[in-house]
Structure formats: structure tokens, C-alpha cells
Amino acid sequence: MSETSYNGWPASKDRLAIGIKSYTVPGTTVKLACAEKVAPLLIGFAEEFHKLIEPIDGSNDDWGYCYRMVRGSTDKLSNHSSGTALDLNAGSHALGKIGTFDAAKVPMIRALAKKYGLKWGGDYINRKDEMHFEIALDAAKVATLITKLELDNA
């Protein structure tokens, strides 16, 4: 049986087995590793986040793919394990901290996340994770959204 992250996407320690590639976020020197099938959404989101929310500073606190469990779990694979999640400016938005973004930017963060089919860790019910953004759609809906946003050739 193959592994999946908790959002249902294929996960593996073998990056190539699940189509993990590195992509440069336009307008930055930051490279993020993510699943090829979701890359247009994650990288498109990161580009707009950089322009509209805050610069992705490139200080080695921006991540994508990483095979691991959810922090604090022993049996729940993180969405990073499937290359379907990003952490942006983690040094400024630590796990468990609340209110790390300018309050005026929060509605824009939510709108951008929705536009790109993502769930924002700042909206988690329990432990907040304001640096974290993850794919909240299945493969068919991801493909449809990529076409709708005209990211097919991105």
C-alpha cells in the first residue's frame, strides 16, 4: 500500500517517485521543492505572497517538500511529505504563534489561499501555523483550477 499525506496526496521518501521538483519563485531567488502536479498553484501563490503580503526573504526559512510526520505526531504524514505544502518566512511566523502577520494583510492572505485552492495554517482550529499553506483539493480539482487560473504553461 502506498503512503499518503493527510490531504490524500501520494507521499514518499523518494522525491522522484512522487514527482518532486524544485521551482524558483518568480521575482525571487528562492527555490521551493513541490509536487509537479500542484506546482503551478503553490509557486503562483508564493509569487503573489511575495508581491502582496511580504517579501519571501530567502533567508533559508522557506520550505516545500520534506518527508516527515506532522509535528508532534507519530502516525500522521505531513503534507510536506507529498510536496503539497509550503512554509513561507518561517522565522517570522513560528509554529504556534498567533498574530504574526499585520492584521490588515490577513484578509488578503485568506483570499490568496482561496484563489489557489490552499488552506492556511493560520486558520487551523487547534495549533496555529501561520507560515504554512497546503493544497486543500484533490487531483481533479487541482487540474481544473490550474486551467481556470491559466497556469497550464507556468
Regions found by a protein language model. Give the residues of each.
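Active-site acidic/histidine clusters and adjacent loop/turn architecture
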Residues: 1-55
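Intrinsically disordered, low-complexity N-terminal regions enriched in serine/proline/glycine
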Residues: 5, 64-66, 115
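Active-site-adjacent loop/helix surface patches within enzyme catalytic domains
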Residues: 40-84, 92
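Catalytic cores and adjacent binding grooves of peptidoglycan-active enzymes
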Residues: 73, 77-86, 90-154
